[in-house]
């Protein structure tokens, strides 16, 4: 039996559920979570960002069974790693929360971080930058994908 994937999601994935451009791939992703195929890793950074979201967006996470959720906090080590990404100019200072998402996902050893943020996260140059810092500091590489890449197509073995 295959182990369930532990997938860290950022705020763009929650919002993508309700966005015409991204819902086609985001809704099936959340269906897989609800069906017990995926453990979704949620951070306190995501929770803080969702405080500014409309009520219906916040309520999406309440539709996920508790046993499919792993909650994780921003640790001092993750905060420091996020700062290292910024010091290395992988992204600018205004992208600190994005860096914190990546650092948390790296340190909790999530199987993959899923995002719709193409500017700061799901971007080949940025991914190489984050993983370059991870490698230099002795951390695991982080796999970064969109929900579309996590979707099952037809009957897979």
Outline where the language-model segments fall.
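A structural signal for short, well-ordered beta-strand segments and their strand-loop junctions
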Residues: 8-9, 41-43, 113-115, 146
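Generic structural signal for residues in well-ordered beta-strands
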Residues: 40, 71-72, 144
């Amino acid at each position: 039996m295959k182990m369930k994937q532990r997938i860290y999601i950022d705020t763009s994935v929650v919002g993508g559920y309700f966005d015409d451009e991204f819902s086609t791939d985001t809704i099936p992703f959340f269906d897989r979570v609800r069906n017990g195929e995926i453990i979704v890793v949620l951070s306190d950074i995501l929770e803080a960002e969702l405080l500014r979201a409309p009520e219906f967006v916040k309520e999406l996470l309440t539709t996920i069974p508790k046993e499919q959720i792993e909650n994780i906090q921003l640790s001092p080590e993750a905060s420091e790693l996020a700062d290292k990404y910024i010091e290395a100019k992988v992204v600018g200072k205004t992208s600190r929360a994005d860096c914190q998402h990546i650092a948390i996902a790296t340190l909790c050893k999530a199987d993959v971080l899923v995002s719709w943020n193409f500017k700061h996260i799901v971007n080949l140059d940025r991914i190489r930058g984050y993983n370059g810092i991870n490698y230099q500091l002795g951390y695991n590489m982080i796999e970064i994908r969109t929900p579309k890449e996590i979707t099952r197509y037809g009957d897979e073995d």
